[in-house]
């Protein structure tokens, strides 16, 4: 009797049919025909590959192109999906539009959490890189829709420590020293002024009567200036210079006389001028003379009458020139 007849007689045909499509235990899942669909159906995370050429060459990528590639790999079919880029610079793209540094995907670990419409992507870069990629870094991209401020951020760590200002130079070089607005992000800006450039330190807390303050520093100790904002009106006053030991204020700056003005206005010396004398006894005597003082009375023969009277003018010096004093 044929085997098929025996199976039919025993009612085992359905069992045989199911067994022919069953997974084999000794295959340990290797015979699952649609692994991606299987992991999706059971809600499992997908470790896609430990050695994957991400993009296939070393050319630059935009974030949008990177997301399209992830979608083509089924990354959004699972609650969590990850892969690791192959360790070959020539076979992996470089993302250049993050705004916080280039991501070379060679050797990078890529993790995707969420759906195509509400995703979080995390990329961890290795300790060496190519294409200007940032090493030892963790980049995170969050996109819950275009209306919800999608974008990248890069975390600081022991290998990528945060500087005093997180981005070094903030933004691009501005056209002049008044171009940085009061409500701009705090940072250190480079500004063009008169064929050179100057450093603008900008601090903005966006609250209070003085919401922002700026310092302008010129090269080679060429001066420090500041200006402060008022409420929401911005910088109403121009730059004011901070005086230092090497940049002292002029007399005009503080409302004082210059040395030349002082020399032309102030008396620097007083003296008695040349001697004059006149016969007093049996002579004309001495009439009043403006600015003179009597300095001597001579009685040569020692009688009861003065023979001669002596006088000298009072003189004062202004700016090196002596003048006779007038009467009051």
UniProtKB/Swiss-Prot annotation:
InterPro entries: Phage_T7_Gp17_C. Induction: Expressed in the late phase of the viral replicative cycle. Expression of late genes is activated by the viral late transcription activator C. Expressed alternatively with tail fiber protein S' (associated with tail fiber assembly protein U'). The switch from S-U to S'-U' is performed through inversion of a DNA segment called G by the phage invertase protein Gin. It is found in: Virion; Host cytoplasm. Disulfide bonds: none annotated. Keywords: Host cytoplasm, Host-virus interaction, Late protein, Viral attachment to host adhesion receptor, Viral attachment to host cell, Viral receptor tropism switching, Viral tail fiber protein, Viral tail protein, Virion, Virus entry into host cell. It holds the Pfam family gp37_C. GO terms for biological process: adhesion receptor-mediated virion attachment to host cell; symbiont entry into host cell; viral tropism switching. Belongs to the caudovirales tail fiber protein family. Component of the tail fiber that acts as a receptor binding protein. Binds to the primary receptor, thereby determining the host range. Two alternate tail fiber S and S' proteins are encoded extending the host range of the virus. This is Tail fiber protein S'. The gene is S'.
């Amino acid at each position: 009797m044929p085997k098929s007849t025996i199976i039919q007689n025993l009612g085992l045909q359905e069992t045989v049919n199911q067994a022919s499509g069953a997974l084999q235990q000794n295959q340990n899942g290797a015979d699952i025909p649609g692994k991606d669909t299987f992991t999706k159906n059971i809600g499992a995370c997908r470790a896609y590959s430990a050695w994957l050429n991400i993009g296939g060459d070393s050319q630059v990528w935009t974030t949008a192109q990177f997301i399209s590639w992830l979608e083509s790999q089924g990354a959004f079919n699972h609650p969590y999906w990850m892969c690791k880029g192959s360790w070959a610079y020539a076979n992996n793209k470089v993302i250049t539009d993050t705004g916080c540094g280039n991501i070379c995907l060679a050797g990078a670990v890529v993790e995707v959490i969420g759906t195509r419409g509400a995703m979080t992507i995390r990329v961890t870069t290795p300790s060496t890189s190519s294409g200007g990629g940032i090493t030892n870094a963790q980049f995170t991209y969050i996109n819950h829709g275009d209306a919800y401020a999608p974008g990248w951020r890069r975390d600081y760590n022991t290998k990528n420590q945060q500087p005093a200002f997180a981005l070094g130079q903030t933004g691009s070089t501005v056209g002049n020293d008044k171009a940085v607005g009061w409500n701009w992000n705090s940072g250190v800006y480079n500004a063009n002024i008169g064929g050179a450039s100057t450093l603008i330190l900008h601090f903005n807390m966006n609250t209070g009567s003085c919401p922002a303050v700026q310092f302008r520093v010129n090269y080679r100790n060429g001066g420090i200036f500041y200006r402060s904002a008022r409420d929401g009106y911005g910088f109403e006053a121009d730059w004011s210079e901070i005086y230092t030991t090497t940049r002292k204020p002029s007399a005009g700056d503080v409302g004082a006389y210059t040395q030349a003005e002082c020399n032309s206005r102030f008396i620097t010396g007083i003296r008695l001028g040349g001697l004059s004398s006149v016969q007093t006894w049996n002579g004309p005597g001495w009439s009043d003379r403006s600015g003179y003082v009597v300095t001597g009375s001579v009685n040569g023969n020692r009688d009861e009458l003065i023979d001669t009277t002596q006088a000298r003018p009072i003189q004062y010096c202004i700016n090196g020139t002596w003048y006779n004093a007038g009467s009051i």
